[in-house]
């Protein structure tokens, strides 16, 4: 899943709480052809298009935390739908294969092993791993994502199960040899619920099972916000206003979508972003032993602190 979504957590400090003498940082405005927030941040900026720094007197307005009562449902239930699929861009088969190889080698399980793709989204990794001989279950909350995943699996003549559910309520027990959660699909919830998800993963794994988690590195993205990111999707133009709440470490995004059929949509979402020591403690407290940390799939086992776009952490169930 790409993963991402919206406004849960504490509000940022109001603008009048800041020193009036402190000039705001320049706003980075990007024009790109890829839409995923995690790609923009984890790759150090847009891969395609032009990037310019505009000296701005006032940074973009801070996206507010979503009011769940006003909205009626949390942002992760609103974001991941058919319109979202229009913004996800394309990923090459070569990129999918490379990511699947990294996942496969990190988990280190035998062919035929049972593997859970947690927050599988459209299932591209699950389908690729199934084709390589693993028994894969894709788990996601979004029916729109799972429908696409099922269609793609049928096109590739792969048989695997996709399960609709909420990771906070996952009840698997000693069921999997390996679990992976990719593309910053973790951190949507409040602190206690995020910790509960890690506990659910621990319970779902067999003893000695491996958990591979990939999220954007807080220490990396902190240098690049606030920012405005424009990108083109399938029949839509999108703008993301991105801020980091430095108190709660939640990355807050206000996304505006303008469709070619004249519709426009606006949604706010936020994701808890972590530094390595925070993730390590979270995993250790849940009963895991951290085995390896990487910053990119191209450099397994190598992590360069704030210079690493991602935190890819492999942990073993104790």
Where are these regions (language model features)?
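Conserved class I S-adenosyl-L-methionine
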Residues: 55, 60-110, 112-119
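A short acidic, Gly/Pro-enriched loop at the edge of an enzyme's catalytic core
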Residues: 171-178
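SAM-dependent methyltransferase
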Residues: 212-281
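Class I SAM-dependent methyltransferase SAM/SAH-binding core
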Residues: 126-169
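C-terminal lobe and adjacent flexible extensions of AdoMet/dcAdoMet transferase-like proteins
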Residues: 276-318
């Amino acid at each position: 899943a790409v993963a991402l979504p919206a406004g849960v957590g504490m509000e940022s400090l109001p603008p009048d709480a800041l020193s009036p003498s402190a000039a705001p940082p320049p706003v980075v405005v990007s024009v790109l052809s890829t839409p995923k927030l995690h790609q923009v941040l984890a790759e150090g900026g847009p891969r395609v298009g032009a990037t310019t720094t505009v000296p701005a007197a006032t940074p973009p307005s801070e996206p507010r935390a979503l009011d769940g009562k006003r909205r009626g449902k949390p942002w992760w239930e609103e974001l991941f739908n058919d319109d979202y699929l229009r913004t996800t861009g394309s990923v090459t088969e070569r990129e999918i294969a490379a990511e699947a190889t990294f996942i496969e080698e990190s988990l280190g399980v035998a062919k035929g092993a049972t593997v859970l793709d947690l927050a599988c989204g459209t299932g591209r990794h699950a389908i690729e791993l199934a084709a390589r001989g693993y028994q894969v279950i894709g788990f996601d909350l979004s029916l729109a994502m799972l429908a696409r995943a099922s269609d793609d699996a049928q096109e590739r003549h792969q048989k695997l199960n996709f399960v609709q559910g909420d990771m906070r309520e996952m009840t698997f027990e000693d069921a999997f040899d390996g679990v992976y959660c990719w593309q910053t699909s973790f951190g949507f919830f409040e602190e206690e619920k995020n910790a509960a998800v890690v506990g659910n993963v621990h319970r779902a794994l067999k003893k000695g099972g491996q958990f591979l988690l990939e999220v954007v590195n807080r220490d990396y993205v902190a240098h690049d916000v606030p920012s405005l990111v424009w990108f083109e999707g399938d029949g839509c133009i999108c703008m993301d206003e991105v801020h980091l709440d430095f108190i709660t470490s939640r990355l807050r995004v206000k996304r505006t979508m303008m469709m070619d059929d004249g519709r426009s949509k606006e949604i706010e979402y936020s994701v808890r972003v972590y530094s390595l020591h925070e993730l390590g403690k979270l995993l250790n407290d849940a009963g895991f032993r951290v085995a390896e940390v990487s910053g990119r799939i191209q450099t397994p086992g190598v992590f360069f602190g704030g210079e690493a776009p991602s935190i890819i952490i492999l942990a073993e169930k104790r």
